[in-house]
Design a protein with these regions (language model features):
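Exposed loop/turn and edge beta-strand positions of beta-sandwich/beta-sheet ligand-binding modules
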Residues: 16, 78, 108, 142
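N-terminal beta-strand motif that seeds the catalytic metal site of vicinal oxygen chelate
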Residues: 37-90, 143-146
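Short secondary-structure junctions
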Residues: 8-11, 101-106
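Vicinal oxygen chelate
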Residues: 1-29, 86-90, 128, 144-161
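Amphipathic alpha-helical segments
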Residues: 88-104
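Long compositionally biased, domain-poor regions of proteins
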Residues: 98-99, 123, 158-161
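Conserved short beta-strand elements that form part of the metal-binding/catalytic scaffold
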Residues: 29-36, 103-140
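Histidine-centered active-site/metal-ligand motif
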Residues: 14, 81, 120-122, 145
Length: 161
């Protein structure tokens, strides 16, 4: 990314992960992150995982990048989570909680981070695109759909019956 001069949108230490943000050619946000060891996460007794937003050291990240061989995504790499821009985060949260059985991990006004099990988030919904976010139209550039892989088939059967 440094060699290609890909503009970074931002970066943050979230307590459970460190992330760098950029945009693709369609203006979809992309988060590249590294999960910290679980024993460093702020996991509450009720299972909620509290996140923070603190500054990353840009110079430190730049120096690390200079030492690495060219990056190749490993075979079998999976997307860890998806962020969705929505008009109403509470309605979207309720939909995904009911339809996929996801649990609240962290919620603030206008955004929720939800997950299955003890992960910090598999899906996040936010209203940061604004209340007047236009509905997606056929043929529109951008994310049309995503696929959710369920590892526990019994869970899925129970959820759907």
């Amino acid at each position: 990314m440094l060699d290609l001069k890909v503009p970074l949108v931002g970066g943050a230490d979230h307590g459970y992960s460190e992330a760098v943000y950029l945009e693709d050619l369609e203006s979809n946000g992309i988060e590249l992150n590294r999960d910290k060891p679980v024993n460093e996460w702020d996991i509450r007794e009720d299972g909620r995982i509290t996140g923070i937003t603190e500054e990353l050291s840009a110079q430190e990240i730049y120096e690390l990048g200079k030492e690495l061989d060219p990056f190749v995504i490993a075979e079998g790499t999976r997307m860890g989570h998806v962020y969705l821009s929505v008009k109403n985060s509470r309605e979207a949260y309720a939909f995904y909680q009911e339809s996929l059985g996801l649990e609240d991990k962290f919620t603030i006004p206008h955004a929720s981070w939800i997950a299955s099990g003890n992960y910090h988030h598999h899906l996040a919904v936010n209203e940061w695109g604004g209340k007047n976010l236009a509905p997606r139209e056929n043929g529109m550039v951008g994310l049309a759909y995503y696929l959710v892989e369920v590892e526990n088939k019994k869970f899925l059967v129970n959820l759907l019956t």
